[in-house]
Amino acid sequence: MYAIEITVQGTVASDVETKVTESGRSLSKFRLAANERVQDRQTGEWKDLPTTWLSVTCWGRLADHVTQSLVKGTPVVVQGRLRERRYDREVSGVSVPGSSLDLTARVVGPDLNKGVAQFRRTKSPAVRRAEERALAEAGFASAAAQPFVPDSS
């Protein structure tokens, strides 16, 4: 089976659910509503086409950053691997086939066509540890390791 890589503009349509797997890896999920607008050439009116719904899954640092950055209603651009998941569900005692579009995200960002954002770079745990080691070797303790002592003057 070949992977389908896509880029989708849409709106976060659910709260972001966050979990940590048994192996300690972060996982976040949210629903994405993608709406396409087209202009009627004869009337000039804009019309919304039916909404395409996707379930988006993010892993690792991306999952951590999505959890900290996105809320329901945020316009986003998501790039990743698309798969159709088929399932059966019971409706009034009858098994009914269904399907879902699942997108495993590689990149998620704000849709700057819809607003502005301010980017804040994060440091990886390895970089933070290296900086703390360098400070310790230079005779400085990290601020987190130093107890707070109020000024007595």
Set out the residue ranges of the language-model regions.
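Well-ordered beta-strand positions in beta-sheet-rich domains
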Residues: 29, 51-55, 86, 100-102, ...
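Generic beta-structure capping elements
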Residues: 32-37, 81, 106-108, 120-122
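OB-fold/S1-family single-stranded nucleic acid-binding modules
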Residues: 83, 89-115
